[in-house]
């Protein structure tokens, strides 16, 4: 949605007689369609090559799928809220998820990676990372991020001004 705003073509979408939630949903589905296959396949293959069985492969694929959907929902929201959202998204992944979240427990509470890693470790009966979250909490947070980001995306899209 960010590119449609920047190049001023979103006005054409607005005047199409469809429900306002459909455009953000289509953006989320489009980004998930592009992102999920390589993420899930590569994580599944890595689990198969380095893992110890079917449980690890299934848990890895399920966790990668949940995390990818959460990231797609969050980054679709960034596309509506910010200009140059790709740079902000890369900054979030590289700086926040890669460096800051690993440095402290408070910052880790705002990291999708920490919740997905915690869920994966619980599903495989491995030592959970620090800080640890229960499997239920990790599932709820990943689902909550996905749902909240999508809901905010729909609300923001409804309130955008036609330019």
Predicted regions located by residue number:
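Transmembrane helix boundary and interhelical loop/hinge segments in multi-pass membrane proteins
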Residues: 1-14
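Secretory targeting signals
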Residues: 2-3, 24-92, 101, 128-141
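Alpha-helix N-cap/start motif
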Residues: 20-21
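Terminal transmembrane helical anchor/hairpin motif
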Residues: 81, 86-156
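Short cytosolic juxtamembrane segments of multi-pass membrane proteins
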Residues: 158-163
